[in-house]
Amino acid sequence: FKSWSFCTPGCAKTGSFNSYCC
C-alpha cells in the first residue's frame, strides 16, 4: 500500500493507490 501522505486531498479515486486511502 502507498503511504497516506500520497493521498490527494478529498480522497479522489482517480488513481489505483487512492482507492486504498479511502
Swiss-Prot record:
Keywords, sorted A to Z: Antibiotic, Antimicrobial, Bacteriocin, D-amino acid, Lantibiotic, Plasmid, Thioether bond
PTM description: Maturation of lantibiotics involves the enzymatic conversion of Thr, and Ser into dehydrated AA and the formation of thioether bonds with cysteine. The C-terminal lanthionine undergoes decarboxylation. This is followed by membrane translocation and cleavage of the modified precursor. It is not established whether the 2,3-didehydrobutyrine is the E- or Z-isomer.
Pfam family, any one: Gallidermin
InterPro entries (UniProt xref): Lantibiotic_typ-A_Bacillales
Listed GO CC annotations: extracellular region
Cross-link (S-(2-aminovinyl)-D-cysteine (Ser-Cys)): 19-22
Modified residues (2,3-didehydroalanine (Ser)): 5
Cross-link type Beta-methyllanthionine (Thr-Cys), residue numbers: 8-11
Signal peptide coordinates: none
Residue list for modification 2,3-didehydrobutyrine: 14
Cross-link Lanthionine (Ser-Cys): where in chain: 3-7, 16-21
Gene Ontology MF: a single term: signaling receptor binding
Superkingdom per UniProt: Bacteria
GO biological process terms, semicolon-separated: defense response to bacterium; killing of cells of another organism
Keyword hit for NAD: no
The keyword Nucleotidyltransferase is annotated on this UniProt entry: no
Purpose: Lanthionine-containing peptide antibiotic (lantibiotic) active on Gram-positive bacteria. The bactericidal activity of lantibiotics is based on depolarization of energized bacterial cytoplasmic membranes, initiated by the formation of aqueous transmembrane pores.
Family according to the record: Belongs to the type A lantibiotic family.
Entries under NCBIfam families matching the protein: lantibio_gallid
Protein name as it appears in the record: Lantibiotic mutacin B-Ny266
Species the sequence originates in: Streptococcus mutans
